């Protein structure tokens, strides 16, 4: 199921607009949730980059430092068509810190460096702060109304277009792999294809719950998550009224699956519901099981934190917010304006 087919929380937006008329209209600042140690065999490098692919920057840092590309890590991929600030981690055991004054890469600026004891691993961040500018908005008041709704009720926690690659190629190739039409040897491609498969399955289940307006209605066997935590527990039928109130109060969140080679995590009615909407992905799920990917859960909704906006003129609005790691700003924008799909392709790294 492509993003255009997923259900909206507040209905498809009537207002149109443009995101990313230029990279400066999409600013991302990584929030690791911790500060570097100040000592250790790893060197943390904080970079501001414009129009640069994350892996390309990592490879450039590796060449400059004279180390293998595998010795440079980062917490996550960032959008290419954007201005992004993120940390890279160079493993330099017993080596002097390179003189970054002579490091030159178009579109990149080194902000600071610091030593670190441990490697920076994928996913090791708290979240990201976003500052976006939406232009050529067709209906000022409709966008204003949407922003107020989102401030109160959040948005679907869908995986965005970036997860599926340009023109959905990651998911297309995953399906070919699942059908034994191709062999995938490259580790990074295997990871991208499996991730796209699981993301599509999550989106399908989350969209189905939203279509039935059950995104915040606890049903028997639901897997519930403490807000902001990764672990979950199964809703006991005897406690449904209490659990329902905790969901309404924002203490708990209803989740959908990122399937793996084990059980979904739900039971009874909720498990039956999820299996129904995962059935079209049976071959991809078999691939995921074969590759022994560990399953997990993800909240169906996400609440943008510190959401604020300022109208620069009647058809241009600047929006700022913070999202936890793994959530997509483009899924927030999707609830605000109806974008031309030709513009959406500029979002994919």
Curated annotation (Swiss-Prot):
Record: active site: 79
EC number: 5.4.99.27
SUPFAM superfamilies: Pseudouridine synthase
Annotated residues for binding of substrate: 26, 128, 328
Catalytic activity: uridine(13) in tRNA = pseudouridine(13) in tRNA
One GO CC term on file: cytosol
Gene Ontology molecular function terms on file: RNA binding; tRNA pseudouridine(13) synthase activity
Domain of life assignment: Bacteria
Disulphide bonds in the chain: none
Keyword field contains Isomerase: yes
Family under the similarity heading: Belongs to the pseudouridine synthase TruD family.
Full protein name: tRNA pseudouridine synthase D
The organism of origin for this protein: Photorhabdus laumondii subsp. laumondii (strain DSM 15139 / CIP 105565 / TT01)
